Structures are given as C-alpha cells and as structure tokens.
Amino acid sequence: MDSNTLSSFQVDCFLWHVRKQVADQELGDAPFLDRLRRDQKSLKGRGSTLGLNIETATCVGKQIVERILKEESDETFKMTMASALASRYLTDMTIEEMSRDWFMLMPKQKVAGPLCVRMDQAITDKNIILKANFSVIFNRLETLTLLRAFTEEGAIVGEISPLPSLPGHTNEDVKNAIGILIGGLEWNDNTVRVSETLQRFAWRSSNENGGPPLTPTQKRKMAGTIRSEV
C-alpha cells in the first residue's frame, strides 16, 4: 500500500472525528451534517477496500495532525490559510466550448446524486479527453460548473453538469460521476483521458495514461451501470 494513501486515510479519519464532535455539540448546519454523513460512508468504503481499522487509523491520524501543528509556526499557518481559503476558478474549456450546443445519436443519461451524466453511446474507437471548469479550495475541487468529453476532432460526446434542483455536491460526487462517464465511453472501445488540471484537483494521483485511478472492475461496473440504468 502506498504510504500517502495510508496517511491520507488516517488524517481523513481523524478530521471526520473532529467534525463529528462539532456536530454532536450542535454547531453544524445542514450542509455540514450532510457532508459528514456522506464522508462517513466514504470512509467506511475506503477502510474496507484498504483493509484498515477506522478507530486505529483515527488515532494515528491524530498523531500526524498534532505533529504538523506543533512544527508549524503562527506566521506559516497564517500564510497557508490565506492561500488555501482563497477559492480559485479553473478553466479547461473556452467560453465557446462551454456554450456550444451538441447532439447525440444514441443519447444516454443518468442522474448520479446531484449531478447529471449524459453521453452519446454511438461514439466508438475514439480518443477522448475530459475537460472541466470548476472552483478549487484547499487545493481540492470544490464546485463543478461543467465537464465535457471531447474527441480529438473537437466534437462533444459527453457531459456532466450539476442538477439545478439538487444544489451542492462534493468532490466524491464529481469523481463518481466521472467514473460513470469514463466507464460508459470505454465500454464502446474509446480511449479516455482526463485533463491535467482535473487530475490534479479531483484526484490525489492518476494512472500512467492520464486517467483517474479506476480498477478494471470499477470500470466494468460503471459501464454496466450507465447501460442498464439510463
């Protein structure tokens, strides 16, 4: 197991524990509590996948955080917070690419939580890149404005967009939706890669082909999902 994967899980477990204490003292609002529930499910899934005990991981995560806070000076902390709290808007797509109308020969659509995934299943044997415009905070994807899948010729063949009726989504929601889109496109023998900007802020790491670290089993499952549930 990669050491960064382990330490990331341990710190996430401890930070969830801290947020749970905030919720127990009735200091969290509705979005805060909703994210807490979502992240609890995510941590349980990650713990099961990694074969790690959440309680033990939480204790180690506490030690990691305490060590970092002890080593960090007040001035460094202020500078880090000033930089991290400044939300940035990143753009893979031009205004023309975002606003362009597109059509599907074999339209498929799936609602994935608060996001809508659309794709053209008539597209086969193409090299496809996923581009997105989104905001970033704490060096993580915060809010997705729009994601589109483009062929090398510039044709739009897929899209992920927030549902107006379900405002608010998490980084995990976006990753799940991207997994569904990739799975559906790869089912038809297309080669899909993700833009460097999206890789950097949506995933901690990427595979050697420029895509998110999805296992073959995940891809087959996601492809089957979009074929059977749209």
Curated annotation (Swiss-Prot):
A motif (Nuclear localization signal) lies at residues 34-38. One of its GO terms (cellular component) is host cell nucleus. One of its GO terms (molecular function) is protein serine/threonine kinase inhibitor activity. GO terms for biological process: symbiont-mediated suppression of host cytoplasmic pattern recognition receptor signaling pathway via inhibition of RIG-I activity; symbiont-mediated suppression of host gene expression; symbiont-mediated suppression of host mRNA processing; symbiont-mediated suppression of host PKR/eIFalpha signaling; symbiont-mediated suppression of host type I interferon-mediated signaling pathway. A motif (Nuclear export signal) lies at residues 137-146. Residues 205-230 are annotated as: Disordered. Pfam families: Flu_NS1 (PF00600). Transmembrane segments: none annotated. It is found in: Host nucleus; Host cytoplasm. Residues 180-215 are annotated as: CPSF4-binding. InterPro entries: NS1 (IPR004208), NS1A (IPR000256), NS1A_effect_dom-like_sf (IPR038064), uS15_NS1_RNA-bd_sf (IPR009068). Belongs to the influenza A viruses NS1 family. This is Non-structural protein 1. The lineage of its organism: Viruses, Riboviria, Orthornavirae, Negarnaviricota, Polyploviricotina. The gene is NS.
